[in-house]
Amino acid sequence: MKCLIVGCGYVGLPLGAELARLGHEVWGLRRSAVVEDEFKAAGIRPFVADITKPDGLAGLPHDFEWVVNCIASSGGSAENYRRIYLHGMSRLIEWFSASPPKKFVYTSSTSVYGQTDGSTVKETSLTAPSAETAKVLLETERLLLTAVREQKFPAVILRVAAIYGPGRGVWFKQFLKNEACIEGDGSRILNMIHRDDVIGCIIAALRNGRPGEIYNAVDDEPVSQATFFHWLAGELRRDLPPAAPENWAENRKRGVTNKRVSNRKLKMELGYQFKYPDFRSGYTAEILQLEQAGKLPE
């Protein structure tokens, strides 16, 4: 297949490398100047473009068979999200409308679920987020689903949980820096997925995803905050994080949610088997790599 990866960053670059390894022709689109050696080593043909600009895709071929939009925002404001995700998606749909790919996969986020009661959510659950950035992501999903209905655009949506892996993992990094805290009784649920499994889920969606469908990309074991930090403390022989201050939630830029995201549909319909089915297996691998590289803080 001739593939286009829109957003060759933390997920997109290794995704492109894996697709190239599988024998596909891979193009990688990035807003900023690319590091030629990095792309060449991954087997990716670079293309510099800005999907937020009216003519930003000029010169890009129309004949891709698989397209993945896994672009990431460079800033956290709702307006920046709107520019990158919503406006960018609109231009991609317009660009490929005359000659659609066989499959178009968009990586959205489980933040579109605004539940705060610890309930289990699936793809048909209510999406009513309080965070402005999550509202933009939901609006982007709806734009894409409209194109599916009205134009038969072959799009599949993956709602991706908090990604961790090499150099990434917000709660893990906070723990290592002694900046983590436990909220209340620690019962708030954390939903995670290793980067390798994000890549695996995207490829499964390209192969088996049905246009117009949404799939939650999250590991098998959403975990309470207390359980997660107790495990880390035991593995790394460190103290537990302190209790969060009373005004902790008020100081967060993003809304605080508490939900248990189900991956049942993704596993059943896409047939994907997780490399790291829970946080223990994933973080055991990450901790080992840090130890071997001498990068694990004392």
Which functions belong to the PLM regions below?
Residues 64-105:
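NAD(P)-cofactor binding segment of oxidoreductase domains
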Residues 91-132:
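Conserved Rossmann-fold NAD(P)-dependent oxidoreductase catalytic core, especially the SDR/UDP-sugar
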Residues 117-157:
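Catalytic helix-loop patch of NAD(P)-dependent Rossmann-fold dehydrogenases
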Residues 138, 150-153, 163-173, 183, ...:
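Glycine/proline-rich active-site loop of Rossmann-fold NAD(P)-dependent oxidoreductases
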Residues 230, 250-273:
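Conserved C-terminal active-site "lid" loop/helix of NAD(P)H-dependent oxidoreductases
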Residues 278-298:
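Amphipathic terminal alpha-helices
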